[in-house]
Amino acid sequence: MSTLARTAHVTRQTSESSIDLRLDLDGTGASEISTSVPFYDHMLTAFAKHSLTDLTVTATGDTHIDVHHTVEDIGIVLGQAIREALGDKSGIARFGDALVPLDEALVQSVVDISGRPFLVHSGEPAGFEMHLIGGHFTGSMVRHVFEAITFHAGLTVHVTVLGGRDPHHIAEAEFKSFARAFRQAKELDPRVSGIPSTKGAL
């Protein structure tokens, strides 16, 4: 089992956004989030808390045009940081799953730290993508975030909305269930010798 610190510091600077992100996979869930998109701050704070990942994000962007660029770019950087912090993935549990309710909403997430980016995202009710959940954060942004994280972290992720009416509840349950599943998958297991794959690499 690896004894190296599983931390990362990633920055991204484009004409659309400026992002500085630090994380510690073996943290306590502490966070300092400032993305200039308040609802996204709320979701990333929930992700950190429930995945026990210490997370600091400072970001600015062209949110006067749309929040899309900033939201997606932070997802990209978060995915890159997760990949970097995981290292060679030695000693991890690898798989995680979680079923999380938020009042009437219920979401299941399954995570495999596989090295093979793949997202299955389903079950959101009709009209969810167009709904303004908080400020200019629409339901469509939720999928964009998971796509960015999944691709850049090298994860296989299934997020399934099993029920819900309130868009805020649905989105928050998605982030929390993903966080809980990721927490299980990234955990170090002293019984795991080396990389948890019969191929010897992830």
From Swiss-Prot:
It catalyses: D-erythro-1-(imidazol-4-yl)glycerol 3-phosphate = 3-(imidazol-4-yl)-2-oxopropyl phosphate + H2O. The gene is hisB. Belongs to the imidazoleglycerol-phosphate dehydratase family. The keyword Phosphoprotein does not apply. Pfam families: IGPD. GO terms for biological process: L-histidine biosynthetic process. One of its GO terms (molecular function) is imidazoleglycerol-phosphate dehydratase activity. It comes from the Bacteria. Its EC number is 4.2.1.19. The keyword Cell cycle does not apply. Pathway: Amino-acid biosynthesis; L-histidine biosynthesis; L-histidine from 5-phospho-alpha-D-ribose 1-diphosphate: step 6/9. PROSITE patterns: IGP_DEHYDRATASE_1, IGP_DEHYDRATASE_2. GO terms for cellular component: cytoplasm. InterPro entries: IGPD_sf, ImidazoleglycerolP_deHydtase, ImidazoleglycerP_deHydtase_CS, Ribosomal_Su5_D2-typ_SF. HAMAP family: HisB (MF_00076). Keywords: Amino-acid biosynthesis, Cytoplasm, Histidine biosynthesis, Lyase. It is found in: Cytoplasm. This is Imidazoleglycerol-phosphate dehydratase.
